[in-house]
Amino acid sequence: MKQTNERLCALAQKGDATALDSLIDNNKSFIGKVANDLFRSMNLAQSGLNLDTDDLKQAGNMGLWKAVPKFDAARGMKFLTYAAPAIHNAMMDMVRDAFAAFEQRMVTEDKDGILLPARFAG
């Protein structure tokens, strides 16, 4: 029988690594949907950021993992309702980091401190 996210979260908060794995597994399809939607909506396939949906899913898993210790079932909220923003934000953080790295590769300073496209530096 499949355990609820809330029960698995409570066990994971007590240090049960198997419960944490099950919690991630229970929400794999949700994380995949968020990753696919974000990948398409931001046109990441054409962005040059070297990100794919697997990268976003991994970031989403980390977002879910980080939500576990902060979740309070006593507030009456479902775990996934609580974790969804953390999952999305973790994916967006990955995109922002990739974009910053992309910009860094594209721009460099010349000897006078003037920013130039990397292809003109030298």
PLM region descriptions:
Residues 1-101:
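Alpha-helical promoter-recognition and RNA polymerase-docking modules of transcription initiation factors
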Residues 95-122:
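Charged, low-cysteine interdomain linkers and short loop/connector segments
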